[in-house]
């Protein structure tokens, strides 16, 4: 009979934890995979949404549709538009952090953005530049030179229609690769992450667009 009742002589099984790359400012500022990519490519999901809306308008022209059928078509269209936006950011997160789940990537981005002062200043610069642009369009401000931070990305935005190797628009219609896209119980709620907000600036942008 073995004297090792407690199993102290048994080999210990060690499980390897999946390593996730850390987010840093250099990675977020990378032109190919960082925030500049979103600035230069955000029109791609917008074109998908525009096509979806055009198809919806054509379907709604049919006079034999019931009210419930119309509501269903609108619901399906909103779902497809939301799916296109989510797919865009999922593909971007996969390029930024290939080993991270989508929800994990969002958590890391929110957490990093809440404490990094350089990223906060960068974000505020983009928001202020967009507000000034809206004011100029509405004639509320005299046109001025764009900050150097946005000039570089405005040039890259002009190349948005050029093909790139990062992803194609067809990928918006592919099934999400992340099986745990919405359910990650081990990850803290995003609302629990402290984050500096610019609610006043964003509210002003919404009022200008309305």
From Swiss-Prot:
Keyword DNA repair included in the entry's annotation: yes
Gene Ontology biological-process entries: DNA repair; DNA replication checkpoint signaling; meiotic cell cycle; replication fork arrest; replication fork processing
Top-level taxon: Eukaryota
GO terms, molecular function: DNA binding
Gene Ontology terms: cellular component: replication fork protection complex
Keywords: Cell cycle, DNA damage, DNA repair, DNA replication inhibitor, Meiosis, Nucleus
Compartments where found: Nucleus
UniProt keyword annotation of Nucleus present: yes
Chief location: nucleus
InterPro entries: Csm3 (IPR012923), TIPIN/Csm3/Swi3 (IPR040038)
Disordered, as annotated region: 142-162
Described function: Forms a fork protection complex (FPC) with TOF1 and which is required for chromosome segregation during meiosis and DNA damage repair. FPC coordinates leading and lagging strand synthesis and moves with the replication fork. FPC stabilizes replication forks in a configuration that is recognized by replication checkpoint sensors.
Entry's family note: Belongs to the CSM3 family.
Subunit structure: Component of the fork protection complex (FPC) consisting of TOF1 and CSM3.
PANTHER family, sorted: TIMELESS INTERACTING-RELATED, TIMELESS-INTERACTING PROTEIN
Name this polypeptide is given: Chromosome segregation in meiosis protein 3
Species of the source: Meyerozyma guilliermondii (strain ATCC 6260 / CBS 566 / DSM 6381 / JCM 1539 / NBRC 10279 / NRRL Y-324) (Yeast)
